[in-house]
C-alpha cells in the first residue's frame, strides 16, 4: 500500500470528510512522526508498534563493484518494533510468549 491508497481508504471510510482533508491529516501525522524521530524521540502507537531511531556505528565496509575497503560513517537509522496487537493479527492462533519484550 502506498500513501495515496491509504488516503483513499480512509476517505472512503469517512465520507463526511473531504478527500483533501484526509490527505492533509495523513500528511500531518507522518510529518509529526518524522519530526519526533528527527528530534531523537520515540513514537509509540499502542497496539500497532513503536518507531525509534538507533545508532549504527561507523565501520569498515566493501565497495561491491571493486571490492575495495571503504569507511562507512556512523549514522542514525529508523527502527520499528511491532506492537502486541499487530503481531497477534499477523499470526492468528499463535501463542505469543512475549519473547522477553515489554509492550
UniProtKB/Swiss-Prot annotation:
GO molecular function, one term: DNA binding
Biological processes per GO annotation: DNA recombination; regulation of DNA-templated transcription; regulation of translation
GO cellular component: chromosome; cytosol
Xref: Gene3D superfamilies: IHF-like DNA-binding proteins
One Pfam family this sequence matches: Bac_DNA_binding
Signal sequence, start to end: none
SMART domains named among the record's database cross-references: BHL
Keywords: DNA recombination, DNA-binding, Transcription, Transcription regulation, Translation regulation
Cysteines engaged in disulfide bonds, as pairs: none
InterPro entries for the chain: Hist_DNA-bd (IPR000119), Histone-like_DNA-bd_CS (IPR020816), IHF-like_DNA-bd_dom_sf (IPR010992), IHF_beta (IPR005685)
Domain of life of the native organism: Bacteria
PROSITE patterns the record matches: HISTONE_LIKE
Family from the record: Belongs to the bacterial histone-like protein family.
PANTHER family attached to this UniProt entry: DNA-BINDING PROTEIN HU, INTEGRATION HOST FACTOR SUBUNIT BETA
Subunit structure: Heterodimer of an alpha and a beta chain.
Function: This protein is one of the two subunits of integration host factor, a specific DNA-binding protein that functions in genetic recombination as well as in transcriptional and translational control.
NCBIfam families for the chain: hip (TIGR00988), PRK00199.1 (NF001222)
Stated name of the protein: Integration host factor subunit beta
Organism: Rhizobium meliloti (strain 1021) (Ensifer meliloti)
Amino acid at each position: 500500500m502506498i500513501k495515496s491508497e491509504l488516503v483513499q481508504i480512509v476517505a472512503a471510510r469517512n465520507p463526511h470528510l473531504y478527500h483533501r482533508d484526509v490527505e492533509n491529516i495523513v500528511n500531518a501525522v507522518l510529518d509529526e512522526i518524522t519530526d519526533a524521530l528527527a528530534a531523537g524521540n520515540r513514537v509509540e502507537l499502542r497496539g500497532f508498534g513503536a518507531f525509534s531511531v538507533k545508532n549504527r556505528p561507523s565501520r569498515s565496509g566493501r565497495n561491491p563493484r571493486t571490492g575495495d575497503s571503504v569507511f562507512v560513517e556512523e549514522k542514525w537509522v529508523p527502527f520499528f518494533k511491532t506492537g502486541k496487537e499487530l503481531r497477534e493479527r499477523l499470526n492468528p492462533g499463535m501463542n505469543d510468549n512475549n519473547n522477553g519484550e515489554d509492550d
